[in-house]
Amino acid sequence: MASADKLINTDVPEKDVFALHFLRSLSNLRTQNPLNSPDKSIDRVRKIKKAAYVSMARAAGGNSRLWSRALLRRAAKDDNKSVRFSRRKRKVTWKISSKRRRSNQRAPVVEEAAERLRNLVPGGGGMETSKLMEETAHYIKCLSMQVKVMQCLVDGLSQK
Amino acid sequence: MSSSRRSRQASSSSRISDDQITDLISKLRQSIPEIRQNRRSNTVSASKVLQETCNYIRNLNKEADDLSDRLTQLLESIDPNSPQAAVIRSLING
């Protein structure tokens, strides 16, 4: 079947979009957790890391991408602290989707590598291989943009 | 809701051509700084690209971890009267 050559777009927003979302996230953290709160340092690190990923997902388009949607959903579940139950649910979902995916298998060596990739990309478990690659290309662009933003922030704050 | 999305993906993926797969693989290749040009068959290079992608994502996650660590330390120790704090404040409020 001839396919319509749809343009697969993997463009990501500019760096300042990521920076803005991240700074807003950080300032929200500040409001919720004043500096002299009894939070342990490791909890603070975890909150900042989570803010980084959530703001990245929002900057990248929120619900318009499968990976960002999955990331935001996971973050929301974490907040409700029902993690254990939802993890068990997700495992069942992966089993079902891998049965469906078998109809669209590429070469085994490719599928094997794709399986490892599925564990790294948010929401990858339910994606067919070609969709997975599209989402991955977008994801790694956004991730590297987010890392650049964080590096800039660290550099800026480190100057004496 | 997720099952309907999966069935939608299964039907739309049959329309994705091999050309588009090749295109996606080359896009992935371009996004990864370390990967070198591979003259071997498409299948072998596709698996290598995916492997390198996994490594790249793991590295980015590690970098994000380290930077979160550093950022936490810096934000905790920031002097509210320093120029850095003023810059942050203006960026957040502006």
UniProtKB/Swiss-Prot annotation, chain B:
Keywords: Gibberellin signaling pathway, Growth regulation, Nucleus, Transcription, Transcription regulation. It is found in: Nucleus. GO terms for cellular component: nucleus; plant-type vacuole. The keyword Nucleotidyltransferase does not apply. One of its GO terms (biological process) is regulation of timing of transition from vegetative to reproductive phase. Coiled coil: none annotated. Induction: Not induced by exogenous gibberellin. PROSITE patterns: BHLH. InterPro entries: bHLH_dom (IPR011598), HLH_DNA-bd_sf (IPR036638), PRE (IPR044293). Expressed in roots, leaves, stems and flowers. GO terms for molecular function: DNA-binding transcription factor activity; protein dimerization activity. Pfam families: bHLH_ILI (PF23174). The keyword Nucleus applies. Plants over-expressing PRE2 show long hypocotyls, pale green and slightly narrow leaves, elongated petioles and early flowering. They are not sensitive to the gibberellin inhibitor paclobutrazol during seed germination. Interacts with HFR1. Atypical and probable non DNA-binding bHLH transcription factor that integrates multiple signaling pathways to regulate cell elongation and plant development. Regulates light responses by binding and inhibiting the activity of the bHLH transcription factor HFR1, a critical regulator of light signaling and shade avoidance. May have a regulatory role in various aspects of gibberellin-dependent growth and development. Belongs to the bHLH protein family. This is Transcription factor PRE2.
